[in-house]
Amino acid sequence: MSGPASSTGFHIHAEGLHGRNVQPSKPTSDGGVAPTALGEKARVEEDERTDSEKKTFGRTPDGTIFTVPPTRDMVSQLLSPSEPKNLSDIFVLAIISCHIFLLRFLPSSSRVAAFAIIFLFWRAAYNIGIGWLLHMQSNGRTLVCWAKKSNIFVNPSTGQNPHPVLYNLLKWELETKIPEQYSFEDAPTEYNTWLVFRRVVDLILMCDFTSYCLFAIACGGRPAGEGFIMLALRWITGMSLVLFNLWVKLDAHRVVKDFAWYWGDFFYLIDQDLTFDGVFEMAPHPMYSVGYAGYYGISLMAASYKLLFISILAHAAQFAFLVLVENPHIEKTYNAPPPRKRVAVDTDNVKPQDDDVSQDSSVINDNVYSGQAVATLEPSSMHNLLGPHNIDLYRITDSSVLLIQILFSALAILTPSTPVYQFFFVLNAALWRVWYSVGIGYILNRQSHCKMWTRHFVKYGESNQEAWQQWKGTYHLSMTMTYASFIAATWKMYSFPQDWGYGLVLLRHILGASLIALQIWTSASIYESLGEFGWFFGDFFFDQSPKLTYSGIYRYLNNPERVLGLAGVWGAVLITSTKSVIFLALLSHTLTIAFIQLVERPHMQKLYGQSLRRDAGLVRSLKRSLPPSLKQFHGSVDKILDDSIEFIEEFIEAARPKLAAGVKTFVKDTSALFQKYPARITISRLEPDLAGYDQKDYSISLEGTQSSEPAQFERASGKEGEKARSMPDRRGDKKNLMFEYGAPIKVKWTAPLNHSKKDWIGLYMVTDNTSREITRISSQGRWIGTNKASFDSLTCEQGLISSDIVINKFREDGEPKDVASGEMVFSGDKLWWTQGVFEFRYHHNGKHSVMAVSRPFEIRIGRFDDDAIYGDRYGLVRAAIESALLPVVQNCFDRDPEIAPQTVEEQYGSLVDRNGKYSRRVVFAVHQMFGIEFAPEVVRADGNVRNLAWRICNAKKVLAPYSMSRTNGATTPTAEHEG
């Protein structure tokens, strides 16, 4: 991997919610509040305040600006005698006391099981309960909707609050806790909701921590036969981890304050810049990574495997909480895609590519927005290698690697573990490691100095792109064989323990597996930061070096592969405890460090010069904590290392003529797609009482963009009888409803004046429901409520235009009647992104009782007919493809001006690269229109409609011999072609 994070893209590193920079607010893509400056009002107030009266300003989604009062941390509020106590504090302390009394009075035989269940309950309340609440709040602002619907924060004197006792209790509770700069009546609903949510979080977090400590006490003991030295080591190490954990929590709270500690930005945003130092420079997501070191310290002091396993389970649950709840919200709130740069394009000067455009054109830079520049370059390939989802057995790289791995695994499993076989497997692993570091290092060193690898392919008329692809295959094969041979050698040297409870056997396996998992995570983080370009040392092959960025794991470490990237080999050492594996681990680590110092580092210095960072975040944090004498010692050690490395480089340079050799290898790589099949939940709910509602008063009518003419005429395919080939006679004035793929559909509805405010309309496939009276399948999010503020989510209101407009209409029996009417638009994620026949269903009172069903309508993508284009000119065909493709791409991108292009040259919005659903929609449409199947990565790589049209034209040319259409391939000669 090529040094620090090298990438053509711009990266914003998003920390965990408990540790992220609260940046100035900007608008988000969904129209909600996002971090940007909070307006002139905040600035004026800020100018007027003195340094001693600094205030923090918050902003709600509707734009309300308010002063955020200072709050105290949870532990101080609960345990400090100087802090005023209210009813909720007493309740939390009482629950904690019950836990302690339970430990005291439970019989010793049942304490462990009881407190294991209690701790798992509170951990589930944290990760599942709080996680669900935050997920719903992030996506639909559910908690705020609950508060507004119940009117619990509205003054009872207005007559709108049906819960005056609850109102007074909350007012007393919150104003007692926040005596300064806070008024319960004047605070926004979002802020009050957050304060109530905080009290729930306080209860769960305190009980979670208390039950864990009590569970540790119940499990604690001293192993039989343990000596004093081991006892002292256990307790010293355990206490050190606990103290480190305590420092992490305190330092994290010092940086992020209560706002981020209690997930405040799920409710509102603040105008404040936080300085990230200390623990946030040491590790990613420190609250969830190193912030759980105390769990393992307590497990070590308790000497209990039960406690250790539950600690690992709780830690894993916390990471799941981070991935499923916090990270999506962080990405949506703080890492919204930047506005698209639009460049005026002189279309008169943009010439279409010729039919025989060179296959060796340069790769398009993703950051180039000039339509003219992009239009004249051939789109690049996006056939990635790494990852199980990229395995493609049609590629010789992937198929060869897979076959070799199968053969290698068979040899390792089927051969006996005799000393002779063990020797050959260890020797094989050592040779592959030497090749991976020395051989690959030599190639990269020569490539850096004289472009040796590229020159070889140019000599035979190949391009730089071909050299790059061949190199990727060589490196990928070498890497997979290196680790496969190491795993095989480890397997040969490993023997299953006869007694897992003997000594440290089980602990060694747990620590070894943890180190292996750490290496896998490190490799995934490196790949996420570098991409394929950096992973395969792309800056050794392309002079137009990308911008140097430090994102992801490189924010904390300059060379993570130096230590963490080899944690797995030392995990294997712990598991096997054999000298041979120790030798392989030492060899691997030594050669890796030599590779970094002798190959990567000189090239990075030559390429990036002074822009290279000397110290990473972790090193800076450690240096700040060192005394001056140790800092001087560190500097002298660095000088010695630099002098030694310089001597080795000079020695190798002098000996190079004697070591000359050619290096050749095979080509192999990985890519295939695993598809997820969404499960459907069938829900049957029948409204018990529909009396008083006449279904004749309900109706649904549709408006949408009619599909293209080719789609209308495709029903007559020539396979029918003669009568069926003509257009059908339609009786009545209603035309067939056939809408464009992905186009918004407007739904107009009517209902009785007294209809339920919780009525809703859903979109379904016609074949999904056999009953017209009740819907028996979930809408999977494709529904909209007929009235605002009727459901506990704002998502169901997206697309709602109007509600309860009284109109006079004639019913089917001819009787005029006043009814309520409304309009809504289904678009984006509320549509089906496939072809078929669909219908809308009007449902009663939040249930699944059907009151009205719309006319069935069809979504169809018309086939592109290039036979209709006069002649066989490439330019005409491509122009026609561009014209047909542009509206389809716009529909696939939800017609969002920040994403969808307005012209064929305009670049797609950056959100297309982040969310794969957009590119998957496009490749489906292209497959249906042109019969050509692309991978979603191709759409992202092309970047605009013109490049995609070029790729379609090129694919049609390549596949022309297999087509029987006149323009696409050879056909049977006709009389006019003969003679």
From Swiss-Prot:
It is an enzyme of class 2 (transferase). Pathway: Phospholipid metabolism; phosphatidylcholine biosynthesis. The keyword Nucleotide-binding does not apply. Residues 1-63, 704-732 are annotated as: Disordered. Residues 40-56, 716-732 have a biased composition (Basic and acidic residues). Residues 108-113, 221-227, 303-304, 419-422, 495-499, 587-979 are cytoplasmic. It catalyses: a 1,2-diacyl-sn-glycero-3-phosphoethanolamine + S-adenosyl-L-methionine = a 1,2-diacyl-sn-glycero-3-phospho-N-methylethanolamine + S-adenosyl-L-homocysteine + H(+). Its EC number is 2.1.1.17. Gene3D superfamilies: 2.60.40.2840. One of its GO terms (molecular function) is phosphatidylethanolamine N-methyltransferase activity. GO terms for cellular component: endoplasmic reticulum membrane. Catalyzes the first step of the methylation pathway of phosphatidylcholine biosynthesis, the SAM-dependent methylation of phosphatidylethanolamine (PE) to phosphatidylmonomethylethanolamine (PMME). This is Phosphatidylethanolamine N-methyltransferase. It comes from Paracoccidioides brasiliensis (strain Pb03). The gene is CHO2.
